[in-house]
Structures are given as structure tokens and as C-alpha cells.
């Protein structure tokens, strides 16, 4: 599957209300609410992402008989840049609850000029991502 970008901000949705709270200076002071709103964003993202993933048909036995239903062809790998991405990661996991996880610890290493830096990776824990859908959850929030 090629890399794709879906701009969820093109149309008003529940995401708009959640982002309004995240950007609100007063509400930002409530750390628990801020983290929960990031988690809500992850849940909304997961739902939207699920619409473009590949599915296969599977038979399930219901109380009324057999039914053919679409299920994900393969679970994604949810990758997070530690720490800021953790609430967003959890929101995605709330929906992709059988997904594999990948965690990366990285920081900007500045040398000399403040405008130039290298990304230093200190830690990486990940399953093989070869041929897999990887969802990178890194909020990189700019709330000003």
C-alpha cells in the first residue's frame, strides 16, 4: 500500500471539537483532559484509517446462522515516538486492539547552529514492518 495522507480537517467533525479543546489555553492546564483528548484523536484517526485498509471476507457463526463479514486482512503496526505519542498510540490501540506495537525514542541533537540538527535514535523496539501497514502516531502539536 503506498503512503497516503488524508486531511481530516477539511470538513468539520467531532475531531474539530477535540482539537479546539487541545488548543484552548485554559483547558491545556488540565493534563488528564489534554491526554484524554489526544487519546480521542487517536480513536478518531483509527476509525478513519480503517476505511482505507484492505479487508477480507470471513464467515462467522451468529445465533441466527452463518454470516459473511469483512475483517481486516492484516493488523497494522502502530509506531509511536516516545513520550508525546503515547496517548495518541493508546487511542489507536483502543480500535486496532490486535495490532503490533513499535516504539522509538528519538531526539533532536543540536550542534552549533540552533536551526540545524540531527535526529538521534536512542531506542527502537519493533516487529518486522516489511510489507506491513505502519501507522506512525506522533502528534507534533503546534497549539499556538
Q: How should these model regions be labeled?
A:
Residues 1-144:
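PRPP-associated nucleotide enzymes
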Amino acid at each position: 500500500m503506498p503512503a497516503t495522507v488524508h486531511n481530516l480537517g477539511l470538513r468539520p467533525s467531532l475531531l474539530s471539537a477535540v482539537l479546539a479543546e487541545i488548543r484552548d489555553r485554559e483547558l491545556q492546564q488540565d493534563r488528564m483532559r489534554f491526554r484524554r483528548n489526544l487519546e480521542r484523536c487517536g480513536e478518531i484517526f483509527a476509525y478513519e484509517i480503517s476505511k482505507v485498509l484492505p479487508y477480507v471476507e470471513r464467515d462467522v457463526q451468529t445465533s441466527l446462522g452463518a454470516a459473511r463479514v469483512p475483517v481486516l486482512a492484516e493488523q497494522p503496526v502502530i509506531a509511536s515516538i516516545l513520550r508525546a505519542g503515547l496517548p495518541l498510540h493508546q487511542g489507536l490501540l483502543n480500535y486496532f486492539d490486535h495490532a503490533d506495537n513499535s516504539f522509538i525514542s528519538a531526539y533532536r541533537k543540536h550542534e552549533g547552529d540552533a536551526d540545524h540538527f540531527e535526529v538521534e535514535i536512542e531506542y527502537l523496539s519493533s516487529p518486522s514492518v516489511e510489507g506491513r501497514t505502519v501507522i506512525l502516531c506522533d502528534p507534533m502539536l503546534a497549539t499556538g
